Amino acid sequence: MSKELDTVEVSIRVPFGKSKRLSTTASRRARVQSIMYFLAFNAASKYYTNYELLHNGVEVDEQQLISELAGNEQTVHLQLRLKPYNTGEVIRHFVTFREYIGFVGDSDDDITSLALSNVAKFRELPLTDIAAASGKTEVADDRQKEEFQVSDAEKAVFTKELDSILELRPSAQDVLKGGSALSKPCLRSLIISGYNPVPAFFRTKGHLLYLQAVTLEGETLHITATVSGFYVNKSSAIKFDPTLKTDAAVCLTLYELLTKHSKKFASHLSQLEAALKAHESVNYVKPISVFLHKTWFPSSLPSNSIDFTEYQLEALNFQTERNFNDEFQAVKETSSEDIVARLEKEKLLNRVIHDFNVAASKGSMEIFYGNMVAMNPDAPRQEHIFLKNNIFYSFVSDLDGHYQDKGGDAAAHAASNQDLHIIKTLLQSNMRSVRHLLTAVVEFGGVRILAQSPVPGILDTAGMKFIKNEKGEEEAIQAKNDITVCYGFDEASNKVIADAEFGSSLDDFAKVFHLKKHEVDGVELKVASTSKGVVGFDKRNYILDLADNNPLDVGFALENFDAVTDEKARYPHRQTLLRRELVEKWWFSKVDGTGSEMEAAYEEGKFSYNPDAYKIEGIEDETVVELSDYLRKEVVPTLVKEVAEGSITAPFNGEHLVDIMHKNGINIRYLGRVIELAEQELEAQRALREAHLQQVEADNKEFTEWEANYLKHIESLIKERQVTIQKLLAEGKEVPAELKEELKLDDKEIRKPHEKEGVAVNNDQLSVLLTLAQIEIISRSIKHVFRKHCHELPAVIIPTFIAFALNLLFGYCYNKAPIAEFPTDGSDIDFAFTKLTREQLLSEISEQAVLRFRYTLPDGWESRYEHTPFALLRPICNKFGIQLLNKEYFFTREQYQNWRQAQDKKIRSKLVEPVSTFSINDLSVRPIIKVATLTTGVSDDCWAQGAYMINEEEKQATALALFSQSIAFREETSGYVHPTVAESYLALSTIHSKLEKKSEAVALCRKACAIYERVCGFDSFEMIRSLNNLAMLEMANDSPYNAALCLKTIMSILSVVIPVNHPATINSYSMLHSMCSSLQNSSAMIKVLNKLGDIIVEIDGHKSLPYAVNESRLANLYASVGEYKRSLACIESCYELFSKELGVNHKTTVECNSWITGVENLIESTSQSKALAASKAAAAAKQGEKKPAQKQQQSAELRDKSIDELMNFINGGSAPAKKSKKKKNAKK
C-alpha cells in the first residue's frame, strides 16, 4: 500500500492572487481530478470554475493519472488557464457560486423540495474545548487516580449543570427544536433573470445568460453573463438593456463583480467563511450519496424567498436525457486493478445510484400529484405505468394475479421490499456475470410506487406487423419484442425455461444466496422459478423479480396462513420470507458447527436450500424447515433472553428495536412473539424471586431458631464453667489456665455469614422491551389503517384525513367530536372517512395488531399514552411520512388554559382557541423512500487490515493509520456526511479510547455525533448511542461538564421517545454520581442518589434489592457529611430489605446490623460530646478562655474519609486513619 500512496508535490501557476502560484500534494496513483477538487475548495481559487489545466503547454484530462505527468520527478508543474464561458459553464458557475455564498443551507439536500429537515444543533451544545491528555501517572495513589484534574470554574459549571439535570422537565418542543442555520445568504437574492432567453441579436454579441441580484443594501443588479465574464447592465424591472452599464467593468467571476458593488456582501461573506471555518465541515456540507434525515417534527415552515432557480435550472438543463442503467452497468464493467481504480469505480457507482434515487423520488412525487402522463392513460389508475428520464414507474399491486393465492396486493407490497433487500446484497457482491436493475420504492400517503431502470430494449417496440385476417383483409398488429424471458417462469408461454448459456451466468448468484439446484416442472434451475432471466439489447444478462430467492418461513406460513380458513383472521399474505441476515446467521452457525472451512463451504455450495420449497405445491426441502425452526425456536427466544439479561443493550426507541431484530434476522411480524416471550421471561423472573424470598424467609426463621438455641448452648457452657470454677475455689484449688481463657467454641458449629447472591427482576430491561414492542405494533397497525383509508384519496386530501384521525386518537380529551378540516378551496366530494368514529378507529387498529402481529392489544391501551402522546405520535409520523410542525399542541382543555394564562396579557386577548388538537395547517406528508446503497469495499479492506494489526503493540501506529485511511476512502466515495462514515468514526473513537488516546477519542466521537444527527435524526438511536459513548469519553478525559451536557441530552431525548424509565437514564445518573465522587462533592452525590432512588422506586418499588443497595450508598454519604440520623434511617431501611432479600445471616445484612449499632453509638457519642463541649464552653466563657472545638475537627476528618475508612471507624475503629494507613487497611 505504501507504494500506491507515494505522494508528489503539485505546483500550479494561476492568473490570479499575489503569488500567482498554488501548491498541494497528491498521490501518484490519484487522478488529475483530485487536483481539481483541491482548487474547488481552496480559498484563492474556488470562485474560478471555468478553466483547463496544462502540463508542458498541453491540456490534461481530469481522468489522467498524476504518475503519468510526474514521471520520475518529485514535483508536477501545472498551469491553470481560464477558458471562455459557454451557457452551460455560466450555469455551473452560477450554481456553484450560490452554494459558496450561503444559498444552500445546512438542512438542504437533493430532495429538500419533497420534505423538510431540521438544522442540526449538536454543534450548538456548549461543549468546552477538548481537554489535553491528562498528566496523571501510574504512580499516583488511588485517590488521585479517582479525582478529576479540573479547575474550580469547571467544578462550578458542572454543579450548575447537575442542578439543571435534577430539575429536568423537558418538552418535546424544546428537545426536538432545530438549531440555527450556519449558512445564511450574503445576498437578498440571486436568480436567473426573467429577461431570458437571450435574444438572437445579443447572442451574437457573446451574451449567454442574464442574472439578477439584490444586495443586502437593497440595490437590484441586472447582470449579463458573456463569454468573457460578467458585468452589470442597464436593465431595470421595466426596461431591458443588457449593454454594459456606465462605469461598470467586466469581471471574471460573480464574486469579483458583487464584491465591487456591495460592501455588505464582502463583509457578510467573510463572516460566513469564518463561521464555517469554526466548525467541522460535517456540520454543514451537503451530502452527496444519501439524504438528510427528514424529521417528523420540523421546527419551522420553509422560508421561501422569491427564488425559482430550481425550475429555471431544470428548464435550462443542457444534459441529454440520462440513461441510468447504461451508466450503472458501464461503471460496473470498469477495471478495478488497484486502489485508485477501485475508489474511482465506487465513487462513480455511488453517484449514479444516488442520482437515480433522487430522480426516482422526484418522479414518483410527480405521479402522486398527477403531473406525469401515464403510458396507458385509459387503464385504471392502479394499472398505470410511467416512463420518464429512462426510469420506469408502476404502482405496487398484484396486477397480473401472480400473488392471487398468496394475499394479492399485500403480498405484492411485501415482495417489493424483499426485492430491494436482495438488490442491497447484490450491490455489495460486485457480481458481474448477471446484472440487476437500479430500484427504489417510494410510498406516499399509503400508495407505493416501484421505480426501476428498465432492461435495455424491453420497452422498445418492434414496430407493426401486417397479417391477413379471416376475411382476407390485412390487419396491423404489434410485433413481438425480441427481449423475452430465457430463464425462469415465462408468463407468455406459461412455462419454466432454463437456457443453458444464461444458466452458467447464475453460478455466482447461487453461491451468494446459498441456493441449491432443483427441478421445477422437469426443468433444472439454479434460482427461484419466479425470477426471470433476460438478455437486454446491450447483450448483458439481467435477473428480475428477485424476492423469492429468500426461503419461505414455512412454519409461520403453515400456522398463520395455510391453517387459517377464516380470511379475516388469516395473516394478510403468504409472502412470509426469511430475511437475508437470518440465512447468513444460520449458514455461519452450520459451518462453525461442522468444523468446515468457510471458503470451501462457500465454493462447494454447502448448506444450501431450495428457494421454491413450499412455495410450489409438491416441492419440499428439510433445510427450509430447519431455517424456519432456527428462527422461531432459537433466534427469537435467544434475543429476548439476551435483552432481559442485559447482554444486549435495551433498545433506545422503536427503530433501535427493529434494527436489533433485523440484524439478528428476525422479521417484524414476530413482534407479538417477542412480547409473549418477554412476558414469559418477566413472569419466570418474578416467580424465581418469589421462590427466593420464600426460601430466604424460611432460612431466616431457621437461622433465628438456631441462633436462639446456640445462644442457650453458650449460656449453658458458661454456667458449667462458672460451676466448675466455684467448686474449685470452694475446694481451695487453683483454677486451671484453660478456664481463665475465653470460651473456645467449635468452628464447625458456628454459622458464618454467607455471600449468596440475591435475586432481582430485570424490570428495567424487560419493561423497555415490552413497551417499545407494543409501540411498534400499535404504530405499524395505525400505519396500515391509515394506508387503507388514504389509498384512494387525492394527494391534497390526505392531510385532511391525517389531522382528523390524529384528533380522534390523541385529541379526544380536547374535542370529543372533531370535524374533518378541508383545504380552503373546499370539496364537494363526500369522503367516507369523515364518518369514522373513535371507537371504529381503535377497533381497526386492534384488528390489524392481531392480524399482522398475532398480538391482542390490552383494553384501554390508548389511555397509556394520554400523558406521553409524543412517544406514540413520533413512530406513527415516521412510519407514515407525517411531518408535524414543532409547536404547542393541547391534548386537554386544561393544557390550553394553563398555556393561555402563561402568555402575556396583550397576547392573551388576541389568542383564538383551537377547534381541535391538530389542524391541516400543522402538518404535511412526505414520501417514504426506500433505496439500496453501496458500501465501499476498499474502505472495508483497509479497516480489516488495521483490525488485524491493532492488537500487536509494535504495529498499532500502522493500524491507526490504516483506520484513518479507511475513513478517508469512505469519505471520498460516499461523502463526508454518510451513516457508514459516522459508524467508522465511532468505532475508531472506541479504539483510541482503549489505547488511552482520550483526546483523540473525544474528537472522533464528536464528529460521529454531528454526522448521525444530520443523517439519522437528533432523536435517533444512533445519536443516543453516540452521545452515550461521548459522555463516557468526556468523563474519562476529565471533562465532567461536557459529560453532563451529553447525559442531559440523552435523558431529554429518552423522555420524548419512550414513556418508561430506560436503563440508560439509570446509567446516566450513575455516571453523574461517579463524577460527583471524583469531584469530592458529597452534597451533589446525595442529590443524585436521591433522584436515582426515585427512579428505582418507579421501576422496582421500595421493597427491592436495587433500592436497598441505593439506600446503603446514601447511608455512607450521609455519614460522611455528619448527618448521622439520616444515615441511620437509611441503614435501618437497608437492614430490613437486606434481611428479606438476602437473609439475616448474609454478610451484607450482618455488616448492616453492626453498622446500625455503630452509628447509634456514634450519635450517642456525638450527643455527649456536644453536651461536654457546651459545658466546657460555658466554663471557658466564665474564665475568658477559648478552646478549639473537638467536634468540628472530628467532623472535618470524617468528611475526608473513604467509605471503607468510615465503616472501620463506625465499627469500632479509633481516630481517622491517615492516608498511609488507608492502604494498609485496604490490604487487610
From Swiss-Prot:
Residues 671-702 form a coiled coil. It is found in: Cytoplasm. InterPro entries: CLU-central, CLU_dom, CLU_N, CLU_prot, GSKIP_dom_sf, TPR-like_helical_dom_sf. It comes from the Eukaryota. Transmembrane segments: none annotated. May associate with the eukaryotic translation initiation factor 3 (eIF-3) complex. Belongs to the CLU family. This is Clustered mitochondria protein homolog. It comes from Eremothecium gossypii (strain ATCC 10895 / CBS 109.51 / FGSC 9923 / NRRL Y-1056).
